[in-house]
Design a protein with these regions (language model features):
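C-terminal helical subdomain
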Residues: 183, 187, 207-235, 239, ...
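Substrate-binding pocket helix/loop in short-chain dehydrogenase/reductase
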Residues: 98-99, 103-111, 205, 209
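Active-site helix of classical SDR
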Residues: 122, 159, 167
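Alpha-helical segment proximal to the catalytic Tyr-Lys
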Residues: 127, 172-176, 237
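Residue(s) in the substrate-gating loop at a strand-loop-helix junction
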Residues: 143
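Short, small/polar-rich loop/turn modules that mediate ligand/substrate recognition or access, typified
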Residues: 88, 175, 180, 239-241
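Short C-terminal tail/terminal secondary-structure segment
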Residues: 2-4, 148, 229, 240-254
């Protein structure tokens, strides 16, 4: 078995949030492992850059400009992609406000992107997989924020906690169809999203996370992408309903 378990030749993956950060790194690594990668994002410029990086390295990719909060667009992208073996639901946004300052529209916007967008992608891809039928792997993106309380991150943390429960429920329901469902809950990862968030605090959060990590650094998108590849591949054939935490040891829940 060895490294052949990570060979995705002949498989197809849909990656949302593929224009940057964790989504892009995951798309690149899945393509390097041999998968045809369907890259989806609302940022068309970033999406084209991801496509160019994949194809420039000899990989195979297609692009699907879409907003994951639009169920009809997600459904259309899944139909256009056709056969899918893997989903990486990595699209998401961050919002910062205290609990008392959180407005309805703030909560609605974050839940739409970070929970409903994941739900829509999982529903549409799972329907496609069960209709064939064929085994598959759905990978959701949770967050280390579900393991601790962080001031200002109510909307984000609530949405990511919902993703964890969605993942476990889907794993229970889809297991009989040979579809595995797992979540990745990264710690602080250096991405355009976290850079924008941390800039307001003069990058104190990143420095703090690096200091408290036993490994002495924050993560890079590639650190998470390798976890995604593991879950997408046959190397994790007996894993479902699990939450994997590439976080540098910042949190160690049992």
């Amino acid at each position: 078995m060895a490294l052949s378990a990570y060979d995705l030749t002949g498989r197809a993956a849909l990656v949302t949030g593929a224009a940057s950060g964790i989504g892009r790194a995951s798309a690149l690594l899945l393509a390097e492992a041999g998968a045809l990668v369907h890259c989806a994002d609302r940022d068309e410029t970033g999406l084209r850059r991801t496509y160019d990086l994949i194809t420039g390295a000899g990989g195979s990719a297609r692009t699907h400009p879409l907003d994951v909060t639009d169920r009809d667009r997600v459904r259309a992208a899944v139909a256009d992609a056709g056969h899918l073996d893997i989903l990486v639901a990595a699209a998401g946004i961050m919002h910062t406000s205290s609990v008392l300052a959180t407005a309805d529209e703030d909560l609605d916007r974050v839940l739409a992107a970070n929970f409903k967008g994941v739900l829509y992608a999982c529903q549409e891809v799972a329907r496609s997989m069960t209709a064939r039928p064929a085994p598959g792997s759905l990978i959701t993106m949770a967050s280390g924020a579900v393991d601790s309380a962080s001031a200002g991150l109510l909307c984000y943390s609530v949405a990511k906690a919902a993703v964890v429960q969605l993942t476990k429920t889907l794993a229970t329901e889809l297991g009989p169809h040979a579809i595995r469902v797992n979540a990745v809950a990264p710690g602080w990862i250096r991405t355009p999203m976290t850079d924008r968030h941390d800039a307001a605090g003069q990058h104190r959060a990143e420095a703090t996370m690096a200091r408290i990590s036993p490994l002495g650094r924050v993560g890079e998108p590639e650190d998470v992408a390798h976890t995604v590849l593991h879950l997408a591949s046959d190397a994790s054939a007996f894993m479902t309903g699990q939450i994997l935490r590439p976080n540098g040891g910042v949190a160690m829940p049992w």
